[in-house]
Amino acid sequence: MFSPKALPKRTPLARLALAITLSTLGLPFWANTAQAHGGHADMVPLQAGLEEFGATVKWDDYANLFTIAKDGVYLKVKPDSKVAMLNGKRIELTVPVVFKDHTAFMSTDFINQVFQSGLDKTFVVETRPNPLNPLSATEITTAVDIVKKSENYKPGFRFTEVSVKEPPKDQVWNFALTGQNVAQPRQASIVVLDGKHVIEALVDLDSKELKSWKPIEGAHGMVLLDDFATVQSAVETSPEYAQALAKRGINDVKKVVATPLTVGYFDGKDGLAQDKRLLKIVSYLNTDDGNYWAHPIEGLVAIVDLEQKKLIKIEDEALIPVPMKPTPYDGRGRKGVEVKPLEITEPEGKNYTISGNSIHWQNWDFHVRLDSRVGPILSTVTYDDKGKKRKIMYEGSLGGMIVPYGDPDIGWYFKAYLDSGDYGMGTLTSPIARGKDAPQNAVLLDATIADYTGAPTAIPRAMAVFERYAGPEYKHQEMGQPNLSTERRELVVRWISTVGNYDYIFDWVFQQNGTLGIDAGATGIEAVKGVKSKTMHEDTAREDTRYGTLLDHNIVGTTHQHIYNFRLDMDVDGEQNSLVEVNPVVLPNDRGGPRTSTMQTETKVVGNEQQAAQKFDPSTVRLLTNFSKENKVGNPVSYQLIPYAGGTHPVAKGANFGKDEWLYHRLSFMDKQLWVTQYNPEEKYPEGKYPNRSDKDSGLGQFTQDNHSIENTDDVVWLTTGTTHIARAEEWPIMPTEWVHVLLKPWNFFDETPTLNLNSPK
């Protein structure tokens, strides 16, 4: 369940608890002479109390007022005044804010009065728990305890997954539409690592039983957070590695930052045993400038055996001096920019409600939970069309992603990061900073997942939900008539994951007109290579920049790709869907007149999974169509599938390497932008469930081998998008966010413009 960073429940018990909390924060009380309901008021320091509550506090010395903000609630209050402005509306304070000894104090009831004012109705009590709700902290503990008490358990087991086991799809849809409970008991899916061995378990939380225990042959598990500490320790305690560092003039191993990287698969040509649990280590030098990524220790790779917890091999190639130029990215030493405040207020509260993990906004309803591997999973997405809830998508999430590099050198050839499949992007969720990562009016939601020990771990501010202005929805100015235009609003669900040097921002964007967008943004710090060249005018520059761009003295940003795949279990007005291609064509005019040609369209139904695996062609309209449902004029209802709806980098048209590469054969999902498969609840990830060191394609390449029919069936759409990242100077030392966009757009799904009511009289 989410723990919203928002308002306490409006109950006397909650208000009492809040007052007790303030008193236990170490905040000194004093009795103000101001009367509160006929008696003295107990006062606490305003700034400390509000910041502990999660609000931001700003003092304007010129205007002599405080601006206090939290979750879209904005308060402007002056000292010694019983009147404040709450989201632009005047409210009466029981006790004014006062100064004493240069410190502002508020009454112990101030937070309750302001944030319990009744303006905010965002959070609604969940009366019937959703069967897709993520496991609570208690459920995680219970599930792991059941495993630990079983005869199968051994000390040292680690957990890569503890998640809710989804009930059958038809039961979940029935719950979403009618409220009828599912038949399946509450269950937990668990993946355990026993050394290098992977085991899948299923726990029944109702009966408190271990229902299954299944070793998975040949699988290598995910990289866990404690593996980071293992490789750092292995590097720091290796005499051989210390010698290699000394050759480069580095004598303090504590200044070396080791990064744990998966080794990939090269059919033994890399000299690594396939049955070992290994990581490669590329290191950086911490020079105290706050950016060790700018100081790569080039030409040196260590290999660590995670079971032995020691370094087993060193690959020491070229002696390239470590770039030592200070390269901070936090603004130090720069003149600050004066920016006037930009405030977003919602004076009458929010237009959406959150009940448990379910969100309602205008005509949209959906459920969202955070997964430790792929991040947010959106489920049972429906649109209320004039009083009728219509199915659009059963489940949508990031399926997987890969970041392959194109440099063949010893420290680079193996770099092809499966960020979600190898590292778990949900586990690496980056807490969202209000006013920076998301607007001030966002509601921030906590989430709970299991760590590698199986213990529940709370992630603060894991996701943001906010409404925003998005330009005009439509406009027309008829000559001699009043202008007609209306504002477009969007609801955004945002999540950020930091995987090493890169930070990824994912937005699920709901539009009032039925369009659903997915935006993926890459920011953070480029993975750079140390080289000899300082400028492009040196003799070494041509070879140094063969696989990248010279960004700074002795620094090359290597060319690579960011390829994302989204798993979208679309149910367009039901489960009987088909993939349709619509191609605009030029045909001769056979009707007479001066024109010689016409524009027409040709329509084709795609029959099977292998025919559906296609490169993106922007001139073809691709639809997921329900031929059993029609709009008012008889056109079958559809949603358009647009895997690349624009971006700020060159589009990744496919995998930028030869088809004889092992990477190509293991991970074919990245070379096609559209895949459609027949629904199978076990097919979750485009790279397969266990891609680490895999020697074959266990994802979409395998899923489509049977070549099932996708006509009038329950289909899953997999959209691959992304960018080919050619580095540029403006991205160093930190990269402005670069976006790529996916769109799912209604196509004859409605009978008319679905937002005509936006201009209806209120």
Name each model feature, range by range.
Residues 1-10:
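N-terminal secretory signal peptides that target proteins for export/translocation
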Residues 2, 15, 25-128:
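Primary recognition of N-terminal secretory signal peptides and signal-anchoring hydrophobic helices
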Residues 51-85, 152-188:
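N-terminal, post-signal-peptide region of Sec/Tat-exported proteins
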Residues 131-176, 224-268:
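Short, non-transmembrane alpha-helical segments in secretory-pathway proteins
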Residues 154-206, 252-306, 362, 493:
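Exposed beta-strand-loop-beta-strand "reactive/processing" segments of non-cytosolic proteins
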Residues 205-210, 214-223, 246, 286-376, ...:
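Extended effector regions of multi-domain proteins
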